């Protein structure tokens, strides 16, 4: 049985074509635990993600890798005071860490607010004022940390800041 069959009922016609799908999941369904971690238990070494970039770098991750690294990120967030319902803006461009952060935020029940790396400082400030944010996780590239830090300072400077792959003054490095 596949993990999805735990939460989906399918009906097929005589030619094997899908005719109906019914979702059947509990009220406390959590994608991170119920799908990602379940896959990590059932098929830990199965390839879950193949990542590459325009510079020719490539990385591959198994379900066990994503489960472990998302749990580590979830612990970092929890230790920093991020809790269920807290809002976290994420601008990770095309970094593979996006997947660890996304699953981690699902695990703790935080709300991920996606943010493009192309936003100006004023755009970020607008979002901070519209949606009280407890944290921001961003790429270290393209001057994004400077724009984020500037917007946070203008907004009153109360949220936690993380980046990935590189140490940036004023930000904790999530990796």
Label the predicted regions.
Residues 1-61, 65-78, 167:
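N-lobe entry segment of adenylate-forming
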Residues 24, 62, 89-91, 112-113, ...:
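A generic structural signal for short
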Residues 29, 55, 96, 115, ...:
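Residues that cap or initiate secondary-structure elements
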Residues 34-37, 86, 123, 130:
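Acidic side chains
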Residues 40-42, 81-83, 154:
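Generic structural signal for beta-strand residues in well-ordered domains
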Residues 45, 49-103, 120-125, 172-175:
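Conserved AMP-binding/adenylate-forming core of the ANL superfamily
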Residues 79-80, 103, 107-175:
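Structural core segment of the AMP-binding/adenylate-forming
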